Amino acid sequence: MKIEIIETKIGLVKIIYDDTQTKIISVMFIDSSKIKPVKNSLSGLHKYFKGQNDYFTNLDLELKGTPFQRKVWKQILEIPFGETRTYSDIAMAIGNPKAVRAVANACGANPIAIIVPCHRVVGKNNDGGYEYGLEKKLWLLDFEKKNTQ
């Protein structure tokens, strides 16, 4: 399913498509006061990609996952822009030093990429996977490094 929000002269319209994006499931007007957090997120993403590191403030995230995953993601939110931590660092920080593999799995299940910056979590040799491909992870890390100097 794909959701698209379009700003029109008479208000915001939400369109929901099927998985193949060939059929429209729903079209409806939405109350713009209900999507303020979405606008904050979009503004934050624009700031992020301009290299500003005050990009995500006052966001109310709904982290849907297991209690362990949410604990990992909350810890990852603490990693500063331009820095990295290892999977082991995160496991130790949440009080479960043997859960390195589980931390890696939680990173792979992160539903809020970039905002919950799992790309900042690396293996001991500065490697590790990324749900959206290693090329994107390396680009994000390099981008952040360049914008902290």
Curated annotation (Swiss-Prot):
Q: Which UniProt keywords apply?
A: DNA damage, DNA repair, Methyltransferase, Transferase
GO MF: methylated-DNA-[protein]-cysteine S-methyltransferase activity
Gene3D superfamilies the UniProt entry points to = Winged helix-like DNA-binding domain superfamily/Winged helix DNA-binding domain
Its catalytic activity?
a 6-O-methyl-2'-deoxyguanosine in DNA + L-cysteinyl-[protein] = S-methyl-L-cysteinyl-[protein] + a 2'-deoxyguanosine in DNA; a 4-O-methyl-thymidine in DNA + L-cysteinyl-[protein] = a thymidine in DNA + S-methyl-L-cysteinyl-[protein]
GO biological process terms held by the UniProt record: DNA repair; methylation
Catalytic residues at: C118
The domain of life is: Viruses
Going by the record, the broad EC class of this enzyme is: transferase
Which positions carry the signal peptide feature in this UniProt record?
Answer: none
| Record-linked InterPro entries | MethylDNA_cys_MeTrfase_AS, MethylDNA_cys_MeTrfase_DNA-bd, MethylDNA_cys_MeTrfase_DNAb, MGMT_N_sf, WH-like_DNA-bd_sf
E.C. number(s) listed in UniProt: 2.1.1.63
Family, as annotated: Belongs to the MGMT family.
The miscellaneous annotation reads: This enzyme catalyzes only one turnover and therefore is not strictly catalytic. According to one definition, an enzyme is a biocatalyst that acts repeatedly and over many reaction cycles.
The molecule here is called Probable methylated-DNA--protein-cysteine methyltransferase
Organism from which the protein derives: Acanthamoeba polyphaga mimivirus
For this protein's source organism, the top of the classification is: Viruses, Varidnaviria, Bamfordvirae, Nucleocytoviricota, Megaviricetes
